[in-house]
């Protein structure tokens, strides 16, 4: 419930900020940005009502794992939108944008396959696959997109570098949380994991 509320607040905040904006690029930015918490609020509401939840039997585990696949559905839409925001800010070309979003989708889908796998080996293999895709996304952000942004005004460069640093730090926490959470080694419980993912989602 809290996640839904916070995401709705974020949605209305960006609607208010973007209201009456006439600059074409700024309107584009707000249109994309509004969608991110809007989609996330729908995903969190579905999880609140027990939709988007399944159980997976994993070899060697006494109890089946509860997997919130709605979380992955959320990320499959919201993470490309966040990257699209950064790419448009950097004035990146279509090939760069397509590559970045394609690899990002691969990262999310392989993470979901890992979460739904029935053996520890398969789960960790898919996690590794997803993490490699994430590292590629990170590399693209910090090199290709940063180079594109470097050709623009100082204000744009500063904004881009700040947002990219924030994304890099926050997104790095996701594969770490996956591997130590219930979907991985089980060092932290479902409650802590869910809360941590909510904090990361809201902050990102």
From Swiss-Prot:
PROSITE patterns: BACTERIAL_OPSIN_1. Keywords: Cell membrane, Chromophore, Hydrogen ion transport, Ion transport, Membrane, Photoreceptor protein, Receptor, Retinal protein, Sensory transduction, Transmembrane, Transmembrane helix, Transport. Residues 17-30, 91-96, 144-166 are cytoplasmic. GO terms for cellular component: plasma membrane. It comes from the Archaea. It is a multi-pass membrane protein. Pfam families: Bac_rhodopsin. Residues 51-70, 117-123, 187-192 are extracellular. GO terms for molecular function: monoatomic ion channel activity; photoreceptor activity. Light-driven proton pump. Belongs to the archaeal/bacterial/fungal opsin family. This is Bacteriorhodopsin.
């Amino acid at each position: 419930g809290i996640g839904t509320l916070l995401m709705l607040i974020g949605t209305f905040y960006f609607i208010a900020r973007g209201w009456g904006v006439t600059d074409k690029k700024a309107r584009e930015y707000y249109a994309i940005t509004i969608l991110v918490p809007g989609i996330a609020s729908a995903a969190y509401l579905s999880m609140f009502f027990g939709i988007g939840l399944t159980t997976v039997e994993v070899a060697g585990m006494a109890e089946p794992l509860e997997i919130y696949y709605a979380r992955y559905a959320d990320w499959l839409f919201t993470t490309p939108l966040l990257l699209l925001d950064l790419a448009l800010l950097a004035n990146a070309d279509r090939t760069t944008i397509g590559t970045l979003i394609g690899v990002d989708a691969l990262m999310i889908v392989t993470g979901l396959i890992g979460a739904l796998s029935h053996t520890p080996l398969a789960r960790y293999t898919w996690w590794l696959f997803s993490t490699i895709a994430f590292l590629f996304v990170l590399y693209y952000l910090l090199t290709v997109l940063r180079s594109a942004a470097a050709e623009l005004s100082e204000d744009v460069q500063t904004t881009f570098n700040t947002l990219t640093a924030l994304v890099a730090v926050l997104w790095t926490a996701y594969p770490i949380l996956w591997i130590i959470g219930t979907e991985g080694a089980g060092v932290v419980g479902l409650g802590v994991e869910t809360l941590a993912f909510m904090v990361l989602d809201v902050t990102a």
